[in-house]
Amino acid sequence: MSKRRKHSWPQPLKGAESRLWYGGDYNPDQWPEEVWDDDIRLMKKAGVNLVSVGIFSWAKIEPEEGKYDFDWLDRAIDKLGKAGIAVDLASATASPPMWLTQAHPEVLWKDERGDTVWPGAREHWRPTSPVFREYALNLCRRMAEHYKGNPYVVAWHVSNEYGCHNRFDYSDDAMRAFQKWCKKRYKTIDAVNEAWGTAFWAQHMNDFSEIIPPRYIGDGNFMNPGKLLDYKRFSSDALKELYIAERDVLESITPGLPLTTNFMVSAGGSMLDYDDWGAEVDFVSNDHYFTPGEAHFDEVAYAASLMDGISRKEPWFQMEHSTSAVNWRPINYRAEPGSVVRDSLAQVAMGADAICYFQWRQSKAGAEKWHSSMVPHAGEDSQIFRDVCELGADLGRLSDEGLMGTKTVKSKVAVVFDYESQWATEYTANPTQQVDHWTEPLDWFRALADNGITADVVPVRSDWDSYEIAVLPCVYLLSEETSRRVREFVANGGKLFVTYYTGLSDENDHIWLGGYPGSIRDVVGVRVEEFAPMGNDMPGALDHLDLDNGTVAHDFADVITSTADTSTVLASYKAERWTGMNEVPAIVANGYGDGRTVYVGCRLGRQGLAKSLPAMLGSMGLSDLAGDGRVLRVERADAAAANHFEFVFNRTHEPVTVDVEGEAIAASLAHVDDGRATIDPTGVVVLRR
């Protein structure tokens, strides 16, 4: 991971005060110019002060090779700027025009079978194509030269959602780039052979030229897991290398103008190593779309907290989310009433100083015409636009009250997330396909919240070991360095929760031998010899295990065969004799150095974890940490605590009444009176303390 760039935030227009940014993607080229003035009128009404422009406008800006038309974009930016609306200007390189792909079909990426992915949607370019790079960098150069010194442009939006559709390319360009990547990482082909375990299945290589991408190998076969893991690393790096090239061209011509690109961080997405990418942007930005159903709010808060972790608690930018339904799910559920304000304020609570949507005006044609927007098809007279205006007013009040300059207050608890562990657990020849990394951190975040504890979600490379309490949930890969950090954290007094599927392999997906969890067995005080996966695909096979604490394990359990003398069993299995699991330990507490650990050797899910947490916390001497799980409380404060804010969200589907402190400065579906707040479902109250 490279050294992090110094954080730099888009500055207000000349003469304007620093405020929370608010707006969305704006596509004036998709509408007649007579609509633009009405757009600006509605933006002013809603409190919009920034829009992202030109993201998919390459074909409009360069309609023919070498011929540029900036006139329409100049007029749009000028109108916006004179109305006090700043512009986050795109490099416009996200989707190449047809003339380019017709002239150079070699820029199109290939799938694992070698088939060309043709134009017709977006992101049909291959990241490693030198031809595409030449054209993209030329456009960046033209954009930067034309808009250098423009008073209304406050940031660069480089490309868009790198890897959303072209994450994996299997072309010969990609093959050559992968060979170079391996040579840089491993230096010798023998080191590659060792890392990939090529002695298995006669895969030994004599030269870097023998390395090929993980192309199609036939149905029902298994790709080398080390190679597959490295290809995911390479693919993230290849896209990052292109981003850096675009960024550097823009920066060389417009120094001092902050640059970003929009990530896709959620509880269900790990396209790229966004923690690694976070080091290469001036400010971190994210596109997040809510998960319909009972996890909606918790997942929003979880993903926002992870963004705060990726940003290392510097202000970050919510670049895209939706006012209601998206267009790309089999069933595109509408958002619950009130969630426009609630979800956005959850992101603000977790450190976002900018709230933007896709998109400003809902399209009347194209693939995303059914994707909700700030101005829906129904127009100004609609509940969505009224909610958009309410949110704008709330963000304005928070700015007036001094929220800018505050950061999310550090929790006592860190839930650790690791992109590479997710990539490794996606492999199809693992002990079970019912378990991977990314589901467990969200379960822990929600279970902690059920016990009134708001955790920080942080990347494994971050300072998780500076917290009082840390959770390693299915962190499958533990390198020697991370294992050392674990050992030192607990020995020095840290409190650590570790789950099944943690520490099984090193960074090359080589198993830590001697019993699981490999490199930290002594820290957690257990030794696992075998696993007991569970499912319902085979009649009569083990499909669940009851615990004697009243919870139930599904999908996966460790067969813990021995525990340390320093350990205490907090829960065991109650199972029929034939299973071999009766009275086998399931949850084990241990002392190590000056610290304490709890090992959870099975998948309990959110509800099982929530029920087990009081006893687990008690074993660590942390019983007083729990609070009211009906609400999620998040605080923001500045370094001197002169400005201190508390956000209180209703997590339930019923009204809740709770004690609060301070002056209510924003409330949605909530009422505050004499230190008591009544908050309806999807409601939130913000207090200045």
Curated annotation (Swiss-Prot):
Alphabetic keyword roster: Glycosidase, Hydrolase
Annotated Gene Ontology cellular component terms: beta-galactosidase complex
Annotated GO biological process: galactose metabolic process
Species lineage: Bacteria, Bacillati, Actinomycetota, Actinomycetes, Bifidobacteriales
Protein name: Beta-galactosidase BbgII
CDD domains according to UniProt: A4_beta-galactosidase_middle_domain
Gene3D superfamilies the UniProt entry points to: 3.40.50.880, Glycosidases, Golgi alpha-mannosidase II
Disulfide bond positions: none
The family this protein is said to belong to: Belongs to the glycosyl hydrolase 42 family.
Name of the top EC class for this enzyme: hydrolase
The EC number(s) this enzyme carries: 3.2.1.23
Active site per UniProt: 161 (proton donor), 320 (nucleophile)
Gene from which the chain derives: bbgII
InterPro entries: Beta_galactosidase_C, Beta_galactosidase_Trimer, Class_I_gatase-like, Glyco_hydro_42, Glyco_hydro_42_N, Glyco_hydro_b, Glycoside_hydrolase_SF
List of residues binding substrate: 122, 160, 328, 368-371
Domain of life (superkingdom): Bacteria
Catalytic reactions of this protein: Hydrolysis of terminal non-reducing beta-D-galactose residues in beta-D-galactosides
GO molecular function per UniProt: beta-galactosidase activity
